[in-house]
Amino acid sequence: MTAAATAEAELLDLSRQLLAAVAAGDWAAYRRLVADDLTCFEPEAKGQLVEGLAFHEFYFRLPGDPAKPARPVTNTLASPVVKFFSDTVALVAYVRLTQTLDDAGRPVTKPCEETRLWQKVGGTWKHVHFHRSLPS
């Protein structure tokens, strides 16, 4: 495997780890993967550029309903593309397909378009920016 292919595989794996941390509500894993000064545009931000981690931490800290069992969640990166801008900056773009159960217990799949920027800092890739859009 070439160095570029290895780096591409690593970034796709890190992106999957990031989505798994979000799905599991694992703040510690999320923090290991993202930069302190993460920026983003996402539907929850209502068109505003969010900077830092406090906005995201709010969602991780929300209590679950103990009366309801956790729903299974599977995230698939459909048609992922990795583009390197340098040895230390890369873009990962894909459609995320999130499979779960609705309130009636039926399987549902929800798509969203995501673009994520990663920067290698001190030899470690950190997630530094993302843009997530719901299909119109």
Where is each model-derived feature located?
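A short, structured loop/turn motif at beta-sheet edges
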Residues: 82-90, 105-106, 118-124
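A solvent-exposed, acidic/Ser-Thr-rich amphipathic alpha-helical stretch
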Residues: 8-9, 27-88, 94-95, 109
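Short beta-strand segments enriched in hydrophobic/aromatic residues
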Residues: 34-35, 96-98, 131-134
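Short beta-strand edge/turn micro-motifs at domain boundaries
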Residues: 109-136
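Short, cysteine-centered beta-strand-loop-beta hairpins and adjacent loop/turn segments enriched
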Residues: 99-108
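Basic/polar N-terminal segments that are highly enriched at the extreme N-terminus
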Residues: 1-9, 136
